[in-house]
């Protein structure tokens, strides 16, 4: 019988640990373009999954038909090579299992990534790009992530990117109860941000979105005022803090707009926190007197401080991952042995 084949699975990508936000935004895939990217990558593997979040862009490949690095370079070029990691076989599976469990996140233990992995797999499956191996690995990763959250305290009182942004605003402004907050965007992250602002006591929240109906839907659900993006500069002078979490394909706010808003609120600064990737707040805002601009990379200190209380759960979480990956490898070896026996039987007929 021929030797058993190794796990034909790989991941290539970058994340917050290997690339700053200005590099991550170069790799980010625009909403709606995922299908086109998947179709392109399918030339390099029989099964392909794209995981694209604010802190990572990763390509998972099963049934490889070429070099993973070449596959990534074909879509993004070589400019990002110095920030990429490549894992194969067991290491690639372990990576996805840790990602789904929130162990590889900027915010360790965060729960949003579980849904993001599930949607990435469902997108691949819907396009016929997830077969036996990718299905098994993705399902195993999701199950392992669920176990980590239910059997350890890793996700207890976990801070998310959204809550870290609100905590940063509190550190800058003090109590937020009598402050006005403006949220740019109306998606999942914007909804989480509004939830945390409400929990922090903010009474006045303005939700600004390109589609006013979507802004109104979110404002009506959690409380707030809705505003179409075309009126952003009219309401901006009211805002003490701006939290941006939109998937806009360009900067929606520049230094000149912030300068004009500050002129209408003398002696009252504006704190702006951009948790979008790509960023939608122009970095030139930093040069405006009275404006204080932050991005995802500035949240690291808050995230690290929050992790201290949950650090004891990490060894238990990692043990669950090792056990789950071992189960995957046993399945793979059994499957390969069965395929090998069939091949021998067919050859002898």
UniProtKB/Swiss-Prot annotation:
Keywords: NADP, Oxidoreductase, Porphyrin biosynthesis. NADP(+) binds at residues 185-190. Coiled coil: none annotated. PROSITE patterns: GLUTR. Substrate binds at residues 53-56, 105, 110-112, 116. Pathway: Porphyrin-containing compound metabolism; protoporphyrin-IX biosynthesis; 5-aminolevulinate from L-glutamyl-tRNA(Glu): step 1/2. Disulfide bonds: none annotated. It is an enzyme of class 1 (oxidoreductase). GO terms for biological process: protoporphyrinogen IX biosynthetic process from glutamate. It catalyses: (S)-4-amino-5-oxopentanoate + tRNA(Glu) + NADP(+) = L-glutamyl-tRNA(Glu) + NADPH + H(+). The active site is at 54 (nucleophile). Pfam families: GlutR_N (PF05201), Shikimate_DH (PF01488). Its EC number is 1.2.1.70. One of its GO terms (molecular function) is glutamyl-tRNA reductase activity. The record marks 95 as: Important for activity. During catalysis, the active site Cys acts as a nucleophile attacking the alpha-carbonyl group of tRNA-bound glutamate with the formation of a thioester intermediate between enzyme and glutamate, and the concomitant release of tRNA(Glu). The thioester intermediate is finally reduced by direct hydride transfer from NADPH, to form the product GSA. Homodimer. Belongs to the glutamyl-tRNA reductase family. Possesses an unusual extended V-shaped dimeric structure with each monomer consisting of three distinct domains arranged along a curved 'spinal' alpha-helix. The N-terminal catalytic domain specifically recognizes the glutamate moiety of the substrate. The second domain is the NADPH-binding domain, and the third C-terminal domain is responsible for dimerization. NCBIfam families: hemA (TIGR01035). Catalyzes the NADPH-dependent reduction of glutamyl-tRNA(Glu) to glutamate 1-semialdehyde (GSA). This is Glutamyl-tRNA reductase.
